[in-house]
Design a protein with these regions (language model features):
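A long amphipathic alpha-helix within ATP-dependent nucleotide-binding catalytic cores
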Residues: 178, 182-190, 239-283
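Beta-strand scaffold of nucleotide-dependent catalytic cores
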Residues: 150-153, 179-180, 194, 201-237, ...
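Active-site nucleotide/adenylate-binding loops and adjacent lid/helix of ATP-dependent enzymes
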Residues: 4-11, 66-67, 109-192, 197-200, ...
């Protein structure tokens, strides 16, 4: 019987680590449930594995690779040196090691995390995106021809809805200027200004490289009396449990759709996946 490949599991942590750190207590907490599930699955399937918490030292990763000699790296690192913007740099480093790894490659991560570049790429591939402009600090806000209020204002380089709230949706020029100035001052970066398109919040996981598989879609829902203009994934909607309970927000599997709509949803997700050069898995 062939030997099972050795798996090095990497995840990000908030402080410096060593090769021999013990994470058994951390893995008991709810915040570590993803890591716990992965390690439990590897154990149940009989894969030999080692774990390493990554903070800000790629040399430590190299040392663990030399010691453990993994056949594959299970990469769960989403930030480096406590910055989500550095995720692609860790993936680039891992790619240089020449060891197969899970998840998306560095090119796809870089393109997908840039809200402006990703929209330009999708437009090139004839995938509809809202009309948008970038408002840089110290410059006039010049809307594209045909852009109409309401608009939504976001930091260009943040993720996980950081910097997005109900105040991000603006109804007039005065509100637009105020929100753009807020983004400039608070986040020290450009503001993305785009048309606000009301609709449903749907998330689709996609797996694969050449042959893609769309996973069952998930939907974020609100209590019935919540107005339509408040139904979008702000930071509090995603991460503030008290806020979610107050507004009756929950995530569920998307109810069955008309077959044509379902096919269009999956085709669009697959086109986005390929257009942004994603691979492995993404959502």
């Amino acid at each position: 019987m062939a030997k099972k490949p050795k798996v090095l599991v990497l995840f990000d942590v908030g402080e410096p680590t060593s090769l021999d750190d013990d994470y058994s207590e951390d893995l008991k907490s709810e915040d570590w449930k993803t890591e716990r599930h992965v390690l439990n699955a590897l154990k149940a399937l009989g894969y030999p594995f080692a774990v390493l918490g990554v903070h800000n030292d790629t040399g430590l990763i190299a040392d663990m690779i030399e010691r453990f000699e993994p056949d594959v790296i299970f990469n769960m690192v989403e930030q480096f040196d406590s910055s989500l913007g550095n995720e692609n740099r860790v993936t680039s480093f891992l790619e240089l090691q020449g060891i197969p790894l899970t998840g998306c490659g560095s090119t796809g991560i870089t393109l997908a995390k840039d809200k402006v570049i990703s929209k330009k790429i999708l437009s090139y591939h004839d995938i509809n995106v809202p009309k948008f402009v970038v408002a840089a600090p110290g410059q006039l806000i010049e809307l594209e021809e045909g852009m109409q209020f309401p608009l939504i204002v976001k930091p260009v380089r943040e993720e996980a809805s950081y910097g997005i709230s109900l105040k991000s949706v603006v109804q007039n020029e005065a509100e637009l200027v105020n929100r753009v100035c807020f983004v400039h001052e608070r986040f020290k970066q450009e503001a993305l200004v785009e048309e606000y398109v009301p609709g449903r919040e749907v998330y689709v996981g996609v797996l694969g490289h050449d042959d893609l598989r769309c996973l069952p879609a998930r939907e974020m829902t609100w209590r019935r009396d919540v107005p339509a203009e408040a139904r979008f994934a702000s930071y509090k909607v995603k991460w503030d449990e008290g806020y979610r309970q107050r507004w009756g927000i929950r995530n569920r599997f998307l109810p069955a759709l008309d077959s044509l709509i379902q096919a269009d949803l999956e085709a669009t997700c697959s086109a986005v996946y390929r257009g942004l050069q994603l691979n492995g898995y993404a959502r």
